[in-house]
Amino acid sequence: MTPVHFSFTSAFILGLMGLAFHRTHLLSALLCLEGMMLSLFIALSLWALQMEATGYSVAPMLLLAFSACEASAGLALLVATARTHGTDRLQSLNLLQC
């Protein structure tokens, strides 16, 4: 495994571990998701450059577009829950009460 592959794999795993273990605030969960998406975007971009395949160069742009949509939906949910519940703590959110 090259150092580049190791760094992007470790960045993805760190984002996944942060999402799994630091589940106190919604904003920290969204930041971990964004870190995972960023590492996937860079890894896909480098993979398309290494393979010199122009057909696969669309995939990183699609991933980036979906990542932006995910971030905007997450921030909208963050604002909505902060207005209704007064906090962004994930323990105060319950799907049965919302």
Curated annotation (Swiss-Prot):
Catalytic activity: a ubiquinone + NADH + 5 H(+)(in) = a ubiquinol + NAD(+) + 4 H(+)(out)
Enzyme Commission identifier(s): 7.1.1.2
Membrane-spanning segments: 1-21, 29-49, 58-78
Membrane topology qualifier: Multi-pass membrane protein
Enzyme class: translocase
The gene coding this protein: MT-ND4L
Keyword Electron transport applies: yes
Alphabetized GO MF terms: NADH dehydrogenase (ubiquinone) activity
Protein name, UniProt field: NADH-ubiquinone oxidoreductase chain 4L
Family the UniProt entry places it in: Belongs to the complex I subunit 4L family.
Recorded GO CC terms: mitochondrial membrane; respiratory chain complex I
InterPro entries reported in the protein's UniProt record: NADH_UbQ_OxRdtase_chain4L/K, NUOK/Mnh_C1-like
Chief localisation class: mitochondrion
